[in-house]
Amino acid sequence: MSTLCPPPSPAVAKTEIALSGKSPLLAATFAYWDNILGPRVRHIWAPKTEQVLLSDGEITFLANHTLNGEILRNAESGAIDVKFFVLSEKGVIIVSLIFDGNWNGDRSTYGLSIILPQTELSFYLPLHRVCVDRLTHIIRKGRIWMHKERQENVQKIILEGTERMEDQGQSIIPMLTGEVIPVMELLSSMKSHSVPEEIDIADTVLNDDDIGDSCHEGFLLNAISSHLQTCGCSVVVGSSAEKVNKIVRTLCLFLTPAERKCSRLCEAESSFKYESGLFVQGLLKDSTGSFVLPFRQVMYAPYPTTHIDVDVNTVKQMPPCHEHIYNQRRYMRSELTAFWRATSEEDMAQDTIIYTDESFTPDLNIFQDVLHRDTLVKAFLDQVFQLKPGLSLRSTFLAQFLLVLHRKALTLIKYIEDDTQKGKKPFKSLRNLKIDLDLTAEGDLNIIMALAEKIKPGLHSFIFGRPFYTSVQERDVLMTF
């Protein structure tokens, strides 16, 4: 997929990446601060195109710009600073993650950056969190790689001289290449297949004459309900691109315009890979009719996910937010620990680093049936299909329904703030909250809690006392009220 080009002057190595579609990304760079020469670029990654949009010299100049002034950086150990540059005179935007690390025996400041045209600003902003999360984890692994290289080869460096030291430092580039390529592929796929801000209800299941015309009534109810219970994050799989995309558009009706731009339709010709961080994404099964979700990427998603199979009409969901985040952090620590303990580059490959920490044995059956029924979505579906299709009535009714959910979420947040004096006291009674806010159905509570979690992150963990309650323990707690 990638070819290594001869290093351009002034000796900056470059890797060109062959992408299937048009890439909005101009380049990605890895730079460092040299105490004598100032900011220097170590490596450039750029999409392989017929027309060169930025010369290597221009990319080097822009990448150097991200480290200017960092000589006085005084950050905590392990800190990663995210910086966003808009250079109107150059017509580009640069997202740069600045961090400290040990490479070639010296502690210095580094910058991992992506460069896009300024015209892609509106395209990129909804994806900013996804990209930053990806780049942040690349840096975590990169720090370990740099430290291991320095630690394991310090004796060889002393014996073989400084030239050997430079060779050892270069070994981080293949690891970075393997991590940067998926980020470029993600942006390329989003450029061609992202869901538009405005969705015509005529392209969704909600435009059917009657409920059940396109899919089974119970399946549609479970899909929308679980989608809302998992903070609007769903993956839709199937054998027909048309059928998958229709469900994707339907679920995206319940998202904000910005969240829709962070969602992706499936490709008819070939299936995309699952990407953590997207809200809704459609994926095609292979020729055998099977599809495997990568455990690592699913665990790294910021919110729990709903899995919807349109071929067999099944809906599965992950545990609630607080449990998902707890498991995510444990898995991340486990992966980095295994990465640290690896004794060879083959052992450090991404596919072989799988929960080897003895203290963490993840449940591979992370998707479970939708256990909690709701009245909110059921009442909405019963009423919306009584309206005449083909007009704007259903769109207006949907907007009213979403407004009601949002108001309920804000009311729930305010209720908890008043009851706890904005977190100064523990929350007293979940039972009273459910009665006072008319959320006695567990599904209704889960939907409003999920929406409130997006407005005020950490609410789940605060309500249930400790962030590591499992779903079973959580239900036991609810039964005591």
Curated annotation (Swiss-Prot):
- The answer to whether UniProt assigns keyword Nucleus to this entry is yes
Annotated keywords: Amyotrophic lateral sclerosis, Autophagy, Cell projection, Cytoplasm, Cytoplasmic vesicle, Endosome, Guanine-nucleotide releasing factor, Lysosome, Membrane, Neurodegeneration, Nucleus, Secreted, Synapse
Location within or outside the cell:
Cytoplasm; Nucleus; Cytoplasm, P-body; Cytoplasm, Stress granule
Q: Which GO terms describe its biological process?
A: autophagosome-lysosome fusion; autophagy; axon extension; endocytosis; late endosome to lysosome transport; negative regulation of exocytosis; negative regulation of immune response; negative regulation of protein phosphorylation
Gene Ontology MF, one: guanyl-nucleotide exchange factor activity
Single GO cellular component annotation? axonal growth cone
Region: Required for the homodimerization of the C9orf72-SMCR8 complex, residue numbers: 461-481
User: Domain dDENN C9ORF72-type: where?
Assistant: 370-464
Predominant location category: cytoplasm
The record's annotation in PROSITE patterns points to: DENN_C9ORF72 (PS51835)
Q: Return the Pfam families for the record.
A: C9orf72-like
Residue ranges of every copy of the uDENN C9ORF72-type domain listed in the record: 23-194
* Domain cDENN C9ORF72-type, first and last residues per copy: 200-343
Instruction: Provide the disease association from the record.
Output: Frontotemporal dementia and/or amyotrophic lateral sclerosis 1: An autosomal dominant neurodegenerative disorder characterized by adult onset of frontotemporal dementia and/or amyotrophic lateral sclerosis in an affected individual. There is high intrafamilial variation. Frontotemporal dementia is characterized by frontal and temporal lobe atrophy associated with neuronal loss, gliosis, and dementia. Patients exhibit progressive changes in social, behavioral, and/or language function.
**Function as written in the Swiss-Prot or TrEMBL entry:** Acts as a guanine-nucleotide releasing factor (GEF) for Rab GTPases by promoting the conversion of inactive RAB-GDP to the active form RAB-GTP. Acts as a GEF for RAB39A which enables HOPS-mediated autophagosome-lysosome membrane tethering and fusion in mammalian autophagy. Component of the C9orf72-SMCR8 complex where both subunits display GEF activity and that regulates autophagy. As part of the C9orf72-SMCR8-WDR41 (CSW) complex, functions as GEF for RAB8A and RAB39B, thereby promoting autophagosome maturation.
Q: How does it assemble?
A: Component of the C9orf72-SMCR8 complex, at least composed of C9orf72, SMCR8 and WDR41. The complex is formed of two protomers, each individually consisting of one molecule each of C9orf72, SMCR8 and WDR41. The protomers homodimerize via an interaction between C9orf72 (via C-terminus) and SMCR8 (via N-terminus). Within each protomer SMCR8 (via DENN domain) acts as a bridging protein between WDR41 (via C-terminus and N-terminus) and C9orf72 (via C-terminus). The C9orf72-SMCR8 complex associates with the ULK1/ATG1 kinase complex.
Protein name (database record)? Guanine nucleotide exchange factor C9orf72
Q: Give the source species.
A: Homo sapiens (Human)
